[in-house]
């Protein structure tokens, strides 16, 4: 395999070998080619119901928004990289308010049939897991029994000889009231339902507060009569029933989890609704992943619920995450943040995304990932991404636990390094962006001219994400196969490109950053091209069964 410059790469493999692919780049610096398909240097793919849009800015440079090309490559009269194609996903993003409106639509649909308050219908639907057919069947057979069972029938619970019927479901003040819960006799506010079971307001509040966390129907403390949302708010003195609404919404989404998925990102309450799920089996069969984007611009896989994980499919991703969760949190932190200088053994803590390290003590330059000298990394390939089998291991049982552990530790370290580096790059990029923005305002640079930094940062982040998950693919792949070796070569090329772009973020002077704007665009374009190539090569590994997780 030969190598060249960023804009002049050529890799060719025997077309008769069914395990190989051809991958080459055009000498035209404005485009690159995979399997005969020509792509512009910077491809922008955005997804609105999975429709791809290519956007070009005023300088003729494509802008990067949120995704890499994830579609099959084809070529006339040539072997297809991986047979088959998948239909576009049609989805919409909703808030909890939008979900609740859909729940109320179901209630309104049943209102003419049931002829009971909407709040009661909502309770019935939740009790039957939103199975309308089952609810209608039971309602037809034993309507009265069902209402009594769920505490929705007041007539069955009313105490005939009580004095509270004219004031039920209201907070009242009473003198010398004795509460049978706390056994206190005092002047206090009280509350009771039609059943006449009356208690002091403090006891009722404690009771409701405990029940709200359970998310179930709240009934009277002495019978099955149910409290409605307005009752809860009256007793608590503020809108507390919203917690029950949250529980109802969660129940609705859980029941319809084939079509509705919560965004898995922390503190995000967005929900994605996939209108048609019939295409999901085809995505799985062809080793594509149905990636979607929520209202907060978080991209995740609708199928497995993890972050965007190309080139790994959902099965590889799930297996990798399950294995990674067994690791010690302390070990993860040590691997992520600290290492000894290979030359003088001084402890070094990483505070940036770039993997080119310079020891402050002895000035030794080394690679954070492989701990080797940095000089060789500037040429040819990023060799530290290649797992090397020791010769001694060849004579051992391939199932040897020690060998497997070493292999996993190697790839897990790489996975973890790029995950941490992505976060550090992003934080550093945001800081630089603030400085560049201030410079724009000070010297009058247009908004468009300053977009190169955020665009490059998005490309870098996506490149690191794809590179990160490529190590999971490499771990589960047959290392002896020719296509796996090609995949590793593509990893090296992307790793080189990512590190080269990341180094530009180390520039601290805004004026220098602006002068090097063309370099940001060129390197970002190369990162994106290499990212796309690695994704497609990884998918072929999966399609051909060269990469597969153990059952």
Swiss-Prot record:
Catalytic residues, chain numbering: 354
Zinc finger regions, RING-type: 179-225, 341-370
Annotated spans, TRIAD supradomain: 175-388
Domain of life of the source: Eukaryota
Zinc finger feature spans (IBR-type): 242-314
Binding site for Zn(2+) 4: 367, 370, 377, 384
Binding site for Zn(2+) 1: 179, 182, 200, 203
List of residues binding Zn(2+) 2: 301, 304, 309, 314
Keywords noted in UniProt: Metal-binding, Repeat, Transferase, Ubl conjugation pathway, Zinc, Zinc-finger
Protein's UniProt keywords contain Zinc: yes
Entry's Gene Ontology molecular function annotations: ubiquitin conjugating enzyme binding; ubiquitin protein ligase activity; zinc ion binding
InterPro entries per record: Ariadne, ARIH1-like_UBL, E3_UB_ligase_RBR, IBR_dom, TRIAD_supradom, Znf_C3HC4_RING-type, Znf_RING, Znf_RING/FYVE/PHD
Disulfide bond annotation, renumbered to this chain: none
Cross-referenced Pfam families: Ariadne, IBR, IBR_1, UBA_ARI1, zf-C3HC4
The UniProt record lists the keyword Nucleotide-binding: no
PANTHER family: RBR FAMILY RING FINGER AND IBR DOMAIN-CONTAINING
Domain notes: Members of the RBR family are atypical E3 ligases. They interact with the E2 conjugating enzyme UBE2L3 and function like HECT-type E3 enzymes: they bind E2s via the first RING domain, but require an obligate trans-thiolation step during the ubiquitin transfer, requiring a conserved cysteine residue in the second RING domain.
Biological role: Probable ubiquitin-protein ligase involved in the degradation-related ubiquitination of histones. Contributes to the post-translational regulation of histone protein levels by polyubiquitination of excess histones for subsequent degradation.
Subunit structure: Interacts with the E2 ubiquitin-conjugating enzyme UBC4 and histones H3 and H4.
Similarity-based family: Belongs to the RBR family.
Name of this protein: E3 ubiquitin-protein ligase HEL1
Native species: Saccharomyces cerevisiae (strain ATCC 204508 / S288c) (Baker's yeast)
Gene: HEL1
């Amino acid at each position: 395999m030969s190598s060249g410059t960023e804009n002049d790469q050529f890799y060719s493999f025997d077309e008769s070998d069914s395990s190989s692919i051809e991958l080459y780049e055009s000498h035209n610096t404005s485009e690159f080619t995979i399997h005969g398909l020509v792509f512009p240097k910077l491809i922008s793919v955005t997804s609105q119901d999975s429709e791809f849009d290519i956007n070009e800015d005023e300088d003729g440079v494509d802008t990067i928004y949120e995704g890499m090309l994830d579609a099959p490559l084809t070529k006339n009269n040539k072997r297809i990289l991986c047979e088959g194609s998948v239909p576009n996903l049609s989805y919409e993003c909703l808030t909890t308010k939008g979900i609740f409106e859909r729940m109320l639509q179901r209630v309104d649909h049943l209102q003419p049939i049931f002829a009971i308050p909407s709040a009661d219908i909502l309770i019935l639907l939740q009790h039957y897991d939103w199975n309308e057919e089952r609810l209608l069947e039971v309602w037809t057979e034993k309507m009265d029994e069902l209402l009594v069972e769920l505490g929705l029938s007041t007539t069955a619970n009313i105490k005939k000889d009580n004095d509270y019927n004219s004031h039920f479901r209201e907070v009242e003040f009473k003198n010398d009231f004795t509460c049978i819960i706390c056994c206190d006799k005092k002047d206090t506010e009280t509350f009771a339902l039609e059943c006449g079971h009356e208690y002091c307001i403090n006891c009722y509040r404690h009771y409701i507060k405990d029940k709200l966390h359970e998310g179930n129907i709240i009934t009277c403390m002495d019978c099955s009569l149910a409290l409605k949302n307005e009752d809860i708010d009256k007793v608590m003195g503020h809108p507390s029933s919203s917690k029950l609404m949250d529980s109802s919404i969660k129940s609705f989404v859980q029941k319809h989890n084939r079509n509705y998925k919560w965004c898995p990102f922390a503190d995000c309450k967005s929900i994605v609704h996939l209108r048609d799920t019939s295409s999901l089996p085809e995505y799985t069969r062809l080793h594509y992943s149905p990636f979607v984007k929520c209202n907060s611009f978080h991209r995740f896989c609708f199928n497995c619920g993890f972050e965007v994980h190309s080139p790994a499919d959902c099965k590889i991703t799930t297996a990798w995450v399950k294995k990674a969760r067994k690791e010690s949190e302390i070990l993860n932190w040590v691997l992520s943040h600290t290492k000894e200088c290979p030359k003088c053994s001084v402890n070094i803590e990483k505070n940036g995304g770039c993997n080119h390290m310079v020891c402050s003590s002895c000035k030794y330059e080394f690679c954070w990932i492989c701990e080797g000298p940095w000089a060789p990394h500037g040429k040819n390939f990023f060799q530290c991404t290649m797992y090397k089998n020791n010769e001694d291991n060849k004579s051992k049982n391939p199932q040897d636990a020690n060998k497997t552990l070493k292999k996993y530790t190697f790839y897990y370290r790489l996975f973890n390094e790029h995950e941490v580096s992505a976060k550090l790059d992003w934080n550093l990029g945001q800081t630089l962006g603030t400085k560049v923005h201030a410079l724009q305002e000070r010297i009058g640079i247009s908004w468009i001219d300053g977009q190169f930094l955020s665009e490059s940062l998005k490309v870098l982040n996506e490149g690191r994400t794809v590179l990160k998950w490529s190590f999971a693919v490499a771990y589960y792949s047959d290392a002896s196969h020719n296509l796996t070796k090609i995949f590793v070569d593509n990893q090296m090329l992307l790793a080189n490109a990512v590190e080269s772009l990341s180094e530009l973020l180390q520039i601290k002077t805004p004026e220098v950053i602006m002068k090097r704007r063309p370099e940001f665009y060129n390197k970002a374009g190369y990162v994106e091209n290499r990212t796309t190539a690695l994704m497609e090569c990884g998918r072929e590994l999966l399609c051909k069964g060269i990469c597969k997780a153990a059952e």
